[in-house]
């Protein structure tokens, strides 16, 4: 069970949690596609079930993950998912895609304004930005599915029973909010 004893002092508990989580991250990263394994763990005092990965090897884990995970497999599945974001370079790919879409966004915006003027229909302006927002959501979901797939495979390679993982049960985004890296 991942829930820590209430009898332990806060400093000692935090140190145990830090060490446990770092060991778990390194254990799972050994079977992952992550090349640079220089991680920096950030523990966040937030009860929501969340974790994230950021550039520079930063792995953030909310306290809620310890509270809500029923077993190590569930906890490990979230870590594996975040490591998949790192190995697949989702943050960098998102930035590169953002640079590509800036010009497209400007063109869509100008076209939407022109359409609204020509058609004498101000609501025509909404179609372009709505389509852009929909495309961004689709792209984000692609990253999440990719991280689920790579994370799930890595979880198995790391020796975890996939039936105990959160990736196996496919929780809804409301159940686990994950970063877009």
Predicted features along the sequence, with ranges:
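Single conserved hydrophobic/aromatic residue that forms the stacking wall/gate
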Residues: 2-8, 12, 168-181
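Active-site scaffold of zinc-dependent metalloenzymes
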Residues: 49-72, 89
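An active-site-proximal "capping" alpha-helix that borders the catalytic cofactor pocket
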Residues: 1, 6, 21, 143-157
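Second-shell loop/turn segments in exported
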Residues: 9-14, 64-66, 74, 96, ...
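Short alpha-helix carrying the canonical HExxH Zn2+-binding catalytic motif
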Residues: 72-84
């Amino acid at each position: 069970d991942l829930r820590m004893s209430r009898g332990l002092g806060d400093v000692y508990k935090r140190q145990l949690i830090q060490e446990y989580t770092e060991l778990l991250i390194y254990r799972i990263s050994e079977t992952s596609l992550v090349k640079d394994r220089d991680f920096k763990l950030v523990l966040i005092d937030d009860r929501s079930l969340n974790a994230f990965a950021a550039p520079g090897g930063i792995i953030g884990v909310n306290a809620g993950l310890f509270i809500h995970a029923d077993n190590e497999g569930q906890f490990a599945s979230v870590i594996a998912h975040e490591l998949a974001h790192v190995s697949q370079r989702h943050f960098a790919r998102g930035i590169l895609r953002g640079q590509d879409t800036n010009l497209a966004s400007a063109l869509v915006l100008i076209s939407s304004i022109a359409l609204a003027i020509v058609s004498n229909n101000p609501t025509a302006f909404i179609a372009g930005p709505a389509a852009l927002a929909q495309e961004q959501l689709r792209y984000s979901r692609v990253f999440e599915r990719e991280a689920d797939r790579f994370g799930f495979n890595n979880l198995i390679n790391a020796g975890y029973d996939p039936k105990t993982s959160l990736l196996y049960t496919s929780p809804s985004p409301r159940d686990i909010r994950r970063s877009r890296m």
